[in-house]
Amino acid sequence: MSLWIPRQTYADLYGPTKGDRLRLADTELIIEIEHDFAHYGDEITFGGGKVIRDGMGQSSSAHDVLDLVITNAIIIDHWGIVKGDIGIKQGRIVKVGKAGNPDTMAGVDPELVVGANTEVIAGEHMIVTAGGIDSHIHFIAPGQIPEALSNGVTTLLGGGTGPATGTKATTCTPGVWNMARMLQAADAWPVNLGFLGKGNAAQPESLIQQIQAGACGLKLHEDWGTTPAAIDMCLSVADQYDVQVAIHTDTINEAGFLEDTIRAIAGRTIHTYHTEGAGGGHAPDIIKIAGERYVLPSSTNPTRPYTVNTIAEHLDMLMVCHHLNPQVPEDVAFAESRIRPETIAAEDILHDLGVISMISSDSQAMGRVGEVVTRTWQTAHKMKVQRGALLGDSARNDNQRVKRYIAKYTINPALAHGIAHEVGSIEPGKLADLVLWQPAFFGVKPEIIVKGGLIAWNAMGDANASIPTPQPVLYRPMFGAFGGALGATSLTFVSAAAHESGIGQQLNLQKVTSAVRGCRSVQKADLIHNNATPLIEVDPETYAVRADGELLTCEPATSLPLAQRYFLF
């Protein structure tokens, strides 16, 4: 016997279903549920008088059951915007589908059986995304990691050794000894970490040593001398060991111009940091490189999106980060050459066109580690307001744009750095790094951060209260952030050479090491929803940017969503 209920009543009980729409926080972005895995009438819910009870939604006889199920969640990922249950076992995602007890419920996936051994997170009215990946971290201060977690980022890739002058400017962990110490320090934090060695060397020995010591990639930075010889050698060694190379090119064109760098790269895969150039790179035309098929381009978040305040804040920021002296005219000229309104405006549009593929932070070194997710969605909102619907979207929803932008900080950095077999999306077999958001707080303040299948970070109330919700509600570490659970639910990414040599055992690491792979074969075409390769041109006098002949320009935003109203307390 069927019972028909109003759509609004159904949404109130179980969350939105196929065809329902919702707004993402206070943005102009609207999503529409494309598919619902539920079998209507057999939804699985937990609580007093609810479904997940022994012999009802919980199987009495099954032994091979889930460790954790997230029920009736709205899932946003590069592959779709759907509603369903997420099954997790042994810290890994089983799949998205219909969970429950197949003995009493219709449509239950045999891999998603709920039993007495299953924990539950109620996902009704919640959005779930894959844990974010920040691929441009200066490891200056450990305090960056709680900030990143509090914005939904669970994987950090970069370099450094703490607040050393070199680390404040460059994303490198140089040398075998420094690499070992940072790998050991990684054991203290409930996130996945990977470290880039210093790539600036014209001879191979030091580069090989760093890779064998555990570097998951190499970083070329202009402050160490990103010459054509260093670029060529770094890429040659990376090709040999299958690790990624990230590059910050020569702003002052001292060792060569953009064309010289392109010749040195010679068609080999490379991740270009802050591709627009305000964060560094050949002035004024480094942005042209985003159109190359072998370039994996990213932005850092201070220029995301272009606003009336963007230019004003950058000069002092740059002087501090690159150890420049405001009393030296050449240092001031160096800084001023990098800050160009025209290319920053074009950067907004190149993101919307899917030309620039990733967004990262540049943490404490011209970037804010706790704002990667927020600034990504601010950029998407600004482009919706200024440019209208994307091709494939409609007046009903912005699903295509939402998929494009979420890929910029999830699957695409995972693909670029050879870790997509472990993280970056909500797909079977991947580490269960999941972020739960209330829709009204999407992109700003997550509710729950699940790390490797266990809650590691949470917006939690007073621990002495009678219930979990009383103020002050603060982001606090949960049990997944302590003891042996931390090492069992997070990974340290290293080169295959280091992994195979047993670097974890050599250094007595508590976290499992995971080898990066496929770093040298990935191309721009492999990056999801963000693989356009137009011919980009920059006028050397006006800095005007064109893609396939079309002028790329937009007005700076005077106000943004996901801003002050969310940070009153």
UniProtKB/Swiss-Prot annotation:
Quaternary structure (record): Heterotrimer of UreA (gamma), UreB (beta) and UreC (alpha) subunits. Three heterotrimers associate to form the active enzyme.
Annotated S-S bridges: none
Protein source organism: Herpetosiphon aurantiacus (strain ATCC 23779 / DSM 785 / 114-95)
InterPro entries: Amidohydro-rel (IPR006680), Metal-dep_hydrolase_composite (IPR011059), Metal_Hydrolase (IPR032466), Urease_alpha_N_dom (IPR011612), Urease_alpha_subunit (IPR050112), Urease_AS (IPR017950), Urease_asu (IPR005848), Urease_asu_c (IPR017951)
Catalyses which reaction(s): urea + 2 H2O + H(+) = hydrogencarbonate + 2 NH4(+)
Pathway field: Nitrogen metabolism; urea degradation; CO(2) and NH(3) from urea (urease route): step 1/1
Start and end residues of each Urease domain: 131-569
Enzyme type, top EC level: hydrolase
EC numbers: 3.5.1.5
Protein name in UniProt: Urease subunit alpha
Ligand binding (substrate): H221
HAMAP family: Urease_alpha (MF_01953)
Active site: H322
Record's keyword terms, sorted: Cytoplasm, Hydrolase, Metal-binding, Nickel
NCBIfam families in the cross-refs: PRK13206.1, PRK13207.1, urease_alph
Record-level GO BP terms: urea catabolic process
Chain positions with N6-carboxylysine modification: K219
Predominant location: cytoplasm
Cofactor binding, per record: Binds 2 nickel ions per subunit.
